[in-house]
Amino acid sequence: MLPVIAHATTAAHGTAWVKVLLPGRPNSHAGWIPARSATPDNTRWQIVVRISRRTVTVLRGGRPLRTFTAVVGKSSTPTPLGRFFVEEVIALYPQDVGAPYALALSARSDVLQEFDGGPGQIAFHGTSNVGGMPGTAASHGCMRLNTPDITWLAHRIGTGTPVTIST
């Protein structure tokens, strides 16, 4: 599911188009697709990350519902800024790094072209088997949350949920 960020109609043919956020590099890039190719779906959920505060705030219907303290990217591998979305929610095995859940985002690291065999994808994930104290800047760009917090998030947030990461 790709979040729609704009609508337009071409005058010549009357074709309706929607502008959608796209995953991958460059971060926060978008493209236009015919509206007839899109299946409308709405979410009342939104996530806002404030790097300077090291917080993850979950909104429902535009109102803050929960705020969590997170580990964010360290200065050499910062968490990228921009407009993104949740690509997938993954239940991890207890022995996996970042267990028990990961919410993979459309964002990619601005520094690491690959990480641990993957494309340098940014995610919310747990602190299991990777550590880090929420409220610090110590990750490779991901946002790490304590187990109860990432579990709460994973049980409520679905694919396509918009995520805004700012300073």
Write out the residue ranges for each language-model feature:
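SH3/SH3-like beta-barrel superfamily modules
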Residues: 1-36
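Beta-strand cores of secreted/periplasmic/IMS beta-sandwich domains, seen most often
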Residues: 2-10, 46, 54-60, 85
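A short, compositionally biased
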Residues: 13-16, 49-54, 98
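Beta-strand residues in well-ordered beta-sheet regions across diverse protein folds
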Residues: 19-21, 57-59, 87, 125
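Exported/periplasmic cell-wall-interacting domains
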Residues: 24, 37-45, 74-83, 90, ...
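Short, surface-exposed beta-strand-loop junctions and turns on beta-sheet-rich folds
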Residues: 24-27, 62-66, 160
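Short beta-strand segments
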Residues: 29-31, 66-68, 82-84, 120-122
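A structural motif detector for short, solvent-exposed N-terminal "entry" segments of globular domains
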Residues: 35-74
